[in-house]
């Protein structure tokens, strides 16, 4: 930049030769402050100290090596191979070859073999071609051929070969397409072979006359001449837009701080294009609790396309955009050493006997999971009740709707296996909350402890849930200056030992209950002060925390207490309880720390048929809360949707919504599911969903949200007529919510 101008983005073009490029850059740094280098670079330029390279484009194919100061926005060679191999698997490729011209031919060949093996694509051979050697003799008459490393003359050879052999498909790197774009355009435009020249990129179509991409729309506005619409110019434009987006967010711009930005923010979204995740933490050894690998590449949504689409944007993609996981199977997985093989043979007999015995035990135990024999039935005997709930489940469903169904199913399976193991009784399950009854207080405490251990050691197959929890904590820290995130800022090595996957809170209380047998479910239910206190205890806990009341703790023998790691918390005031309750924290996972108890939380007891005298809070009780604007909107939409259905049909429609959103059904005034009751259920759903909508929309301006966040957030789009109707309704005053309720017929 220039003296006194600190709020501008200066770009300087340097013309040099490959041999002089590194020296030219060094000379430039002696005269000017060089923060970053963009565009085409030589290999030795990347070794220049105190310089950050943003999306460097190399003239010769190279595998990516982690350099913290090199940030790749375009797909790396490895990413392209991964996406292209996935495409070949999907079309049933029967024969693949590779022809490589590079100083790293051997290493690139190994990468090709590994990637194709991952997708079970047969690889016939990998051949190395010397620089300057003719390509014609390397191309067969058929099959799928990776040609990695091209010269100007090679393009014409490929065009003629594809025109001559219709069974041949050639796959090239996008960097070669971008660098030799003019040559490709002349050689392939109007030929039939362009349909079988294939490459992969994360760029939208640069010459689409009616683009849907915001990046391309702005690109065309900046460059009105279609002759300038090339891959290289779009790459430069997208990089410039990225810099325009991130530089204002940096207090001080320098080479190191620029690189730090990518690794600190992890992921960046500009004009609908997402880059990341970037990570500068080195890989841990295989088999560690949390595999973390350094990553300086961030291309996402990489699609496979033919050269014919380059000339005609209406031609469909060969493969829809995907973000490669870059995870590979261990080629030695399953292989046994001689000693291991001997051990397996010797232990087979014992293993068979052990499995047989274990199978008998599990069959008996699982048969009793909902067996009423395990239910406490004597009203004169104390019952220990456990309430569990997944922390931030609604937010997790909003962030990961495709993932949470499997995660919650796993959560249910793990809890039920422990219920069977400890001879406990599953009273009921609503959404992701469990109510469990135990005859033994010690069995209940052990069950809750082992639940935390089981969850933290389970292989969830993703780190997305953990990332979301940490993000939620950081967002709360921004809103509340007094809040210190207990896990978000932990070192990864520490975090993976303490936390993993879903976080479940649990509350345990022991006491006498009113016990009733439900003729509909054929199961037992528990009422009175004991379930209320257990529910309130659970509600006060944080995710991953187990709270035990003094009543439960002192129900344990001295020997049983000695086997537990419990920390006294002292008297805790619970909502609706006149006196503070003595509380203990069960340290199931040693080393965990938690935020302050959630004493300001309202309780929604799983037992939705509890007596009103129990004092349990319910949003759908007789004293209705005021419907927010969002809730009124939701209620009107639901009313309009179900208005044409009969009462039994409405029941079938609304029950799944209640289960998914964890909405407790209001108490029935009669026995039938009539129109009035349907209206009450709709109102409960609207209240719950309205809270989420208000929470999501209060923190962000929709227009400012990245596209990826818009897809993950909850929004309702309304017509102008419906909005006017809502506004008229709300202008009627306090009775507006009742008016909305009356329209639900």
UniProtKB/Swiss-Prot annotation:
InterPro entries according to UniProt: A/G_cyclase (IPR001054), Adenylyl/Guanylyl_Cyclase_3/4 (IPR050697), Nucleotide_cyclase (IPR029787)
Extracellular side: 1-341
Gene3D superfamilies: Nucleotide cyclase
Cytoplasmic face of the membrane: 363-745
Places the protein is found: Cell membrane
Keyword Membrane recorded: yes
Protein's recorded name: Receptor-type adenylate cyclase
Species of origin: Trypanosoma congolense
């Amino acid at each position: 930049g220039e003296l006194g101008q600190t709020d501008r983005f200066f770009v300087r073009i340097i013309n040099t030769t490959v041999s002089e490029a590194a020296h030219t850059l060094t000379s430039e740094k002696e005269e000017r402050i060089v923060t970053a280098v963009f565009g085409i670079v030589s290999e030795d330029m990347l070794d220049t100290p105190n310089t950050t390279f943003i999306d460097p484009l190399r003239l010769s194919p190279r595998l990516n090596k982690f350099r913290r100061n090199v940030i790749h926005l375009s797909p790396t060679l490895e990413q392209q191979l991964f996406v292209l191999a996935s495409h070949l698997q999907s079309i049933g490729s029967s024969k693949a070859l590779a022809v490589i011209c590079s100083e790293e031919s051997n290493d690139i060949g190994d990468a090709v073999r590994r990637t194709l093996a991952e997708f079970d694509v047969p690889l016939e051979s990998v051949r190395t071609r010397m620089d300057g050697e003719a390509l014609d003799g390397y191309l067969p008459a058929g099959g799928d051929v990776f040609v990695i490393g091209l010269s100007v003359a090679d393009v014409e050879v490929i065009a003629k070969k594809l025109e001559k052999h219709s069974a041949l498909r050639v796959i090239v790197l996008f960097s070669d397409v971008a660098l030799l774009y003019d040559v490709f355009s002349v050689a392939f435009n109007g030929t039939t072979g362009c349909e079988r020249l294939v490459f992969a990129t994360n760029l939208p179509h640069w010459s689409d006359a009616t683009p849907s991409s915001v990046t391309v729309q702005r690109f065309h506005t900046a460059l009105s001449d279609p002759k300038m619409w090339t891959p290289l110019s779009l790459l430069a434009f997208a990089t410039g837009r990225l810099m325009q987006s991130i530089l204002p967010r940096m207090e001080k711009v320098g080479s190191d701080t620029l690189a730090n930005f990518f690794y600190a923010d992890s992921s960046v979204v500009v004009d609908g294009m997402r880059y990341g995740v970037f990570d500068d933490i080195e890989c841990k050894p295989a088999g560690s609790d949390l595999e973390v690998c350094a990553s300086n590449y961030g291309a996402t949504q990489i699609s496979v396309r033919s050269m014919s689409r380059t000339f005609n944007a209406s031609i469909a993609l060969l493969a829809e955009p995907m973000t490669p996981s870059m995870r590979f199977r261990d080629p030695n997985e399953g292989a046994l050493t001689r000693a291991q093989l001997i051990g397996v043979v010797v232990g087979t007999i014992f293993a068979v006997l052990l499995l047989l015995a274990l199978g008998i035990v599990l069959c008996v135990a699982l048969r009793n999971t909902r067996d009423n024999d395990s239910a406490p039935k004597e009203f004169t005997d104390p019952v220990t009740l456990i309430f569990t709930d997944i922390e931030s489940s609604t937010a997790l469903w909003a962030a990961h709707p495709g993932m949470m169904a499997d995660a919650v199913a796993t959560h249910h399976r793990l809890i039920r296996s422990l219920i069977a193991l400890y001879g406990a009784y599953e009273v009921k399950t609503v959404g992701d909350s469990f109510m469990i009854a135990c005859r033994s207080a010690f069995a209940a405490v052990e069950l809750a402890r082992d639940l935390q251990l089981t969850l933290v050691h389970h292989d969830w197959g993703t780190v997305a849930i953990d990332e979301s929890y940490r993000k939620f904590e950081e967002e709360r820290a921004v809103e509340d200056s007094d809040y210190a995130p207990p896990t978000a800022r932990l070192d990864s090595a520490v975090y993976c030992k303490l936390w993993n996957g879903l976080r479940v809170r649990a509350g345990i209380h022991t006491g006498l209950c009113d016990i009733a047998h439900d003729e509909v479910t054929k199961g037992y239910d528990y009422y009175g002060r004991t379930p209320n206190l257990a529910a309130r205890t659970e509600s006060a806990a944080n995710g991953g925390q187990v709270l035990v009341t003094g009543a439960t703790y002192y129900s344990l023998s001295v020997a049983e207490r000695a086997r537990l790691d419990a920390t006294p918390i002292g008297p805790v005031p619970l909502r609706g309880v006149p006196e503070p309750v003595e509380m203990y924290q069960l340290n199931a996972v040693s080393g965990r720390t938690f935020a302050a108890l959630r004493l300001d939380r309202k309780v929604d007891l799983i037992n939705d048929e509890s007596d009103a005298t129990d004092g349990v809070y319910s949003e759908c009780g007789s004293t209705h809360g005021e419907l927010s604007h969002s809730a009124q909107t939701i209620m009107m939409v639901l009313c309009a949707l179900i208005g044409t259905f009969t009462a039994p049909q409405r029941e079938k429609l609304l029950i799944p919504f209640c289960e998914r959103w964890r909405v407790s059904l209001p108490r029935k005034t009669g026995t039938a599911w009539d129109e009035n009751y349907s209206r009450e259920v709709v109102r409960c759903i609207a209240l719950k969903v309205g809270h989420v909508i208000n929470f999501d929309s209060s923190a962000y301006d929709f227009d400012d949200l990245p596209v990826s966040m818009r897809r993950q957030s909850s929004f309702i789009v309304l017509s102008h007529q419906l909005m006017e109707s809502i506004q008229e309704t709300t202008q009627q005053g306090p009775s507006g919510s009742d008016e909305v309720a009356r329209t639900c017929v």
